[in-house]
Amino acid sequence: MADFSAKTPCRILSLDGGGAKGFYTLGVLREIEGMVKCPIHEKFDLIFGTSTGAIIAALLALGRSVKEISDIYEKHVPTVMQKKNRREKSLALAKLGDEVFKEDKFDKMKTGVGIVTTRWVIERPMIFKTSIEQAHGRVGTFSPGFGVKVSNAVQASCSAYPFFERKMVKTDKGDLVELIDGGYCANNPTLYAIADAIMALKLPPENIRVVSIGVGVYPSPKQSWFSSTKWAQMLMSVQLLQ
């Protein structure tokens, strides 16, 4: 597990959401892994991820190499994304999660983790964490990942409603929580990771080092006001805000 001693810098890796653009994240991580010449989880004390970044973060924290994760992406991501509707996409995502993570829970992680999801009803973050040291004062009731399987937490972080169905998870306290993609709260989870380091781990800001990997910006071609696609996108935005 990570050493959260104030004597050494706390090294944070933050991975953005972005769907299939996670291939870009993996390209950057491949270079980092080549530089440090060891598994990435050995070089970072906290690895936070949202959506596609959550998949990568969880696999890195479980000790997988970037090559292994890239192979999973190349084999399975096109299959999930090519499904016709949200039910089929969600079923494919659940199947993939169960195959990759099996029965693993958060106590299997080799370093500190934060998997960012969004509570559907109250529109607030729910972050699945590994270490009791990340508990922000709720030490007495903390359990790694709320007792939820890694597979279910990652599926929730990727459940970009309405393109995927909402994900229901059951905590070890028996609570049923309906979750959607963490990107609705923080597509870039860096601030949540820094909050853990400063507020929960009580580390001074000068002892924090952050590597934040986004997925790039890809402007869409300008569309005419008379375009049906433009009006459909505007309608979708309004629905998401309601």
Predicted regions and their residues:
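Patatin-like phospholipase
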Residues: D3, K7-F101, I132, R138-S143, ...
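Conserved beta-strand elements of the Class I
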Residues: R11-L13, E178, V211
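Conserved acidic residues
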Residues: D45, V177, I208
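Active-site-proximal beta-strand/loop segments in catalytic clefts of secreted hydrolases
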Residues: T50, T118-R119, G183, I213-G216
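Non-catalytic peripheral regions of patatin-like phospholipases
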Residues: K67-A92, L96, T130-H136, G145-F146, ...
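A short alpha-helix-loop-beta-strand transition element characteristic
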Residues: K102-T111
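Active-site gating loop/helix substructures
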Residues: K110-M199
